[in-house]
């Protein structure tokens, strides 16, 4: 029996995967299933609750705060993901060149990503403070402004402030991953295109971008997922304020379920995020399949 398992790669692989699969079932599947169940109940903290069907979801559709949180989440995800992509791609192209000390710069660029989220959020909270902001202090000393900017006191200032914090933290992940993709592109493609008279822009458009598209699809999928479900940055910097202007679906779910004690309502908000996350995953999947088909791969 043991010899058969050793000779069967599939069976041996399944055995090695079993411990991880059990852990995933315990720590991922069970909480997800419990969350789905709670979303259909009126459970409160300390009280199991009863089955109420879709009442929580019907209430959320008409709830103005939930509607605002959905808008904030989509706006936050769209702007932050786009900025992270363009800045990350620019940094990746820059670091892919033969620069002096490029190894050092590649290491430095990872610092925002490896710093604990709560620590970086506290730093940004200090940077955006209405009284002690170093940004406002510098601008006042330079004569650009007369009074300190209230970064977190008005809705739109707060929205763009937390977007800036998310971009600062997320750009390294995009840049390093795209840089790894650029390293896989053979220099012979660029040499051949240069012989044909291609300009740097034409090389980027017709060589770099098509070959990098699968990596871009994967990176942006993870970027969108991480941004859409962001919690720590928002909770530490603004806690959803001012006037719920920076509440995301994740922070609102926490506020309703933990702070407010409405476990069923909070769970319903969390489950309502799932269709948007699935849409992002499916968009990436079909994008990869389309690119594989265009490049002559198997159309699955």
Where are these regions (language model features)?
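Short, Lys/Arg-rich, polar N-terminal cytosolic tail immediately upstream
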Residues: 1-8
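A structural signal for multi-pass alpha-helical bundles of membrane permease subunits
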Residues: 9-300
């Amino acid at each position: 029996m043991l010899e058969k398992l050793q000779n069967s790669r599939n069976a041996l692989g399944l055995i090695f995967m079993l411990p991880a699969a059990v852990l995933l079932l315990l720590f991922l599947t069970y909480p997800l299933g419990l969350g789905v169940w709670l979303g259909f109940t009126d459970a409160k903290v300390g009280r199991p609750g009863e089955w109420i069907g879709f009442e929580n979801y019907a209430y959320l559709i008409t709830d103005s705060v939930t509607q605002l949180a959905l808008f904030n989440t989509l706006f936050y995800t769209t702007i932050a993901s786009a900025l992270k992509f363009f800045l990350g791609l620019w940094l990746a192209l820059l670091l892919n060149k033969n620069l002096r000390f490029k190894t050092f710069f590649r290491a430095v660029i990872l610092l925002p990503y490896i710093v604990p989220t709560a620590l970086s959020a506290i730093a940004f909270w200090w940077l955006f403070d209405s009284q002690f902001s170093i940004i406002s202090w510098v601008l006042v000393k330079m004569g650009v402004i007369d009074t300190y900017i209230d970064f977190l006191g008005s809705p739109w200032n707060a929205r763009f402030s937390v977007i800036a914090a998310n971009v600062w933290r997320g750009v390294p992940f995009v840049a390093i991953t795209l840089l790894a993709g650029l390293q896989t592109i053979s220099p012979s493609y660029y040499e051949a295109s240069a012989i044909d008279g291609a300009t740097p822009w034409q090389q980027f458009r017709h060589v770099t971008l098509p070959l990098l598209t699968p990596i871009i699809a994967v990176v942006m999928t993870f970027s969108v997922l991480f941004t859409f479900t962001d919690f720590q940055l928002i909770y530490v910097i603004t806690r959803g304020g001012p006037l719920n202007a920076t509440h995301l679906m994740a922070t609102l779910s926490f506020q309703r379920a933990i702070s407010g004690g409405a476990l069923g309502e909070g769970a319903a908000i969390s489950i309502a995020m799932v269709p948007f996350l699935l849409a992002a995953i499916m968009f990436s999947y079909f994008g990869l399949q389309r690119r594989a088909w265009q490049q002559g791969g198997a159309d699955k």
